[in-house]
């Protein structure tokens, strides 16, 4: 589970706002040490908790594989893949690629060990994106508290924004309905058995299909942007009561 944990076309956040603030898209194209730290800290949390959530959900529904291998942990080193999490993103950045894509070390899930494989597979797949949604809310609350207490610290403000949008981005991207993404697992669990088997045959080619769709801008324009707006629109009212506390 969770072979892909990041696939973000640069600039797809440009139309997204939270309250009266807009996300600074330049944060994606600024590769200073400070900008890297601003993005890396929430991104490491986003990836680590995403993968651990898959393992925890699998254990909850009967498969202890990830737990026995020590993957139900918040230690990011357990989830980092040297190639997919480090080398590929760095190479794309240095090449000034129009998109960033990477993946963490997949959390092993034995679907045949789940008590109700067809249904439980959906919940295990949803756990990762669900954790990113919760983290987006956390970072939104952090942002509101910073503003509410008049903490004028650009580093913390930028990190809060990055935390919201990396998590929304990972949430939306991983819900794309193509294996090995979480959305593909969810769709496979919903489809009738025969159609699910046929759909599963796409998985060996999923990585290349996703790259092609990223390169052509299809995922960014027709999936990432509208669904990011949708989930931001959900986060905003959930955090509005706290925002009202600090509004004169």
Question: Whereabouts are the PLM-identified features?
Answer:
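Hydrophobic transmembrane alpha-helices and their immediate loop junctions
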Residues: 4, 10-13, 19-248
């Amino acid at each position: 589970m969770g072979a892909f944990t990041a696939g973000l076309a640069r600039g797809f956040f440009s139309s997204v706002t939270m309250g009266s603030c807009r996300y600074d898209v330049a944060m994606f194209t600024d590769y200073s040490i400070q900008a890297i730290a601003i993005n890396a800290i929430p991104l490491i949390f986003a990836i680590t908790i995403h993968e651990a959530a898959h393992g925890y959900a699998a254990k909850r529904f009967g498969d202890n594989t990830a737990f026995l291998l020590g993957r139900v942990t918040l230690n990011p080193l357990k989830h980092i893949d040297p190639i997919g999490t480090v080398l590929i993103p760095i190479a794309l950045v240095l090449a000034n690629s129009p998109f960033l894509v990477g993946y963490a070390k997949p959390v092993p899930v034995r679907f045949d060990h789940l008590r109700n494989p067809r249904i439980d597979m959906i919940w295990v797949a949803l756990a990762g994106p669900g954790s990113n949604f919760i983290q987006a809310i956390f970072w939104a609350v952090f942002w509101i508290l910073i503003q509410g207490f008049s903490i004028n610290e650009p580093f913390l403000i930028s990190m809060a924004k990055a935390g919201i949008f990396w998590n929304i981005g990972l949430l939306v991207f991983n819900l794309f309905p193509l294996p090995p993404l979480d959305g593909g697992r969810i769709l496979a669990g919903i489809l009738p058995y025969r159609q699910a088997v046929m759909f599963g045959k796409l998985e060996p080619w999923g990585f290349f299909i996703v790259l092609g769709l990223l390169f052509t801008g299809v995922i960014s324009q027709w999936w990432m942007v509208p669904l990011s707006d949708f989930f931001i629109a959900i986060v905003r009212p959930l955090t509005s009561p706290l925002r009202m506390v600090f509004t004169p």
